[in-house]
């Protein structure tokens, strides 16, 4: 390998239990999510990795163990399934169903607000999930669009049930600092921090989500946090004129600042607007064959229950074989067009040298207001200004696919997804000289 390039094939892969872990799918301040493949069954999964020391230090063991055990027993079509739980000396691994249809938020960012019937359909699926988990004694406490993902068939699934308490608990400033950095979806009683009913608080968050789906913007959105808190606590908002009377009635009953008089899920299920086109979920809830022994083992201090993390060299294959054999790195995804909407991550190809690509990215990012830190063939960019969800931060890495072909991967590591969309549009415009236009190359070959 020359000094100016990195190979696309990693030096090693981490293997935990039966799972070989791949690239990072998402990253937060308390957990990282990685793509994984079960080497025995071939099944794909997502693995959420928690810091074991943080869990024990913040005395979250019993609550997490109880809620994860309950969630492992839940097999609902609108809830991301927990498959198994493992632990090493330093990490807790929660193996989750891989849902690869993208966030519901991305659909809004791409299309704008949804039509009322489509918004209602997603809202019905959200309420199905929340109602079922509440019936099992598990509350989400941090519902927002980032927790709502779509499967390949467009079915809504809710993620992070049973884990949100930990995400807030480990922050120094407590409840107000939710995973997205703002309290826009949080109920007034949660903001007041006087103790609250988890069911009523989740219903409020569902109401904010419904408003966003139908309006395309938040009902409560102020740059000044104190002003925002006051508006939320007084439920100061107005519905846009395109909302139907039925939708307005439901949203106003949900966004009721008093949790005692707020509409319950039982009442919501009887509402005429909600019932339009409603199809109750059909599924088997047979948990006789499901064991939670792995959850107990993961949170125990027994060394016998720990899995080992192994670094293994991958099977030797050329880069195009690697790309073609994995749905995560399909050629269709690899050579995506510039105009296509990006989500939390994207990649492009270039026939320029790695050093030239690095220089061009640095040169393009700085005028956009980003601080740039380089490390070999990785770049970390952080915005100077704080947006709706803190400073936007982006990680990039250059890989060599062939001597004259590189892949550049960009991933949002912090900040707002919509701001990342805007950043990528400007960033890719500045990089047009180094991005390989595969359509043009194909035309040249035909001639």
Swiss-Prot record:
Chain positions with Phosphoserine modification: 164
Gene3D superfamilies xref list: Kinase associated domain 1, KA1 (3.30.310.80), Phosphorylase Kinase, domain 1 (3.30.200.20), Transferase(Phosphotransferase) domain 1 (1.10.510.10)
Tissue expr: Expressed at low levels in roots and shoots. Detected in root vascular bundles and in the leaf vascular tissue and hydathode, but not in root tips.
Keyword field contains tRNA-binding: no
Annotated disulfide bonds: none
Keywords linked to the UniProt accession: ATP-binding, Cytoplasm, Kinase, Manganese, Nucleotide-binding, Nucleus, Phosphoprotein, Serine/threonine-protein kinase, Transferase
Ligand binding (ATP): 25-33, 48
Cofactor(s) named in the record: Mn(2+)
Active-site residue numbers: 142 (proton acceptor)
Region listing for Activation loop, in residue ranges: 160-189
Phosphothreonine modification, residue list: 178
Gene Ontology BP, a term: response to salt stress
Top-level EC class as recorded in UniProt: transferase
Pfam families: NAF, Pkinase
UniProt GO cellular component terms: cytoplasm; nucleus
Complex and partners: Interacts with CBL2 and CBL3.
Protein's job: CIPK serine-threonine protein kinases interact with CBL proteins. Binding of a CBL protein to the regulatory NAF domain of CIPK protein lead to the activation of the kinase in a calcium-dependent manner. Involved in K(+) homeostasis under low-K(+) stress.
Family: Belongs to the protein kinase superfamily. CAMK Ser/Thr protein kinase family. SNF1 subfamily.
Domain notes from UniProt: The activation loop within the kinase domain is the target of phosphorylation/activation by upstream protein kinases. The PPI motif mediates the interaction with the ABI (abscisic acid-insensitive) phosphatases.
PANTHER family noted in UniProt: CALCIUM/CALMODULIN-DEPENDENT PROTEIN KINASE KINASE-RELATED (PTHR43895), CBL-INTERACTING SERINE_THREONINE-PROTEIN KINASE 9 (PTHR43895:SF145)
Protein name: CBL-interacting serine/threonine-protein kinase 9
Species lineage: Eukaryota, Viridiplantae, Streptophyta, Embryophyta, Tracheophyta
Gene field: CIPK9
